Amino acid sequence: MFSYRHGFHAGNHADVLKHMVLVQVLEHLLQKDKPFWVIDTHAGGGLYDLTSNYATKSGEFEGGIGRIWPLRKAAGTPVAVKALLDQIAALNNGTDLRWYPGSPQLAAQMLRQGDHLRLCELHPTEIGLLRDHFAGVKRGVSIEQVDGFTDLPKVLPPPPRRGLVHIDPPYELKDDYKKVLQALRAARERSATGT
């Protein structure tokens, strides 16, 4: 346990797909002028340096975000791809690709005042990175060193009764697959209108 480090995999093809969907769901929730919560059960470090030893050792980002990064200025780029690339470009000041946002960073960039981001992470190194990354953020972010699977039922439904739950464990343990299903069932029982 705790051998998984997302820095090796940040920006890979699976991250790109997951984050395209996340940005689209967030954009949909933002259409209503009502606050909502984002709960990330396995937040990771929040932000990843693609020039780090982790990222360059695996090189996985090259087949993911590295492959579509040139499309940010291309005509005809699909809307979902463009929306994600715009978020990543804002983080990189529109220039070279160095920083890749994890789900917490993407959500933080998009949320409004009154919305809330709850981040759960159990990994001792990742929680430190997450806390460091969000150290200057005083509004609307809570970070908990807890098992996101067991924490989720305790915080549902969120106070505004609108929310998005993001569940993406490292699948380091075989029972993570079973725990995802159990968490989804528990979430559905506690908050039938959640996303």
Residue ranges and their predicted role:
Residues 1-195:
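Class I S-adenosyl-L-methionine-dependent methyltransferase catalytic core
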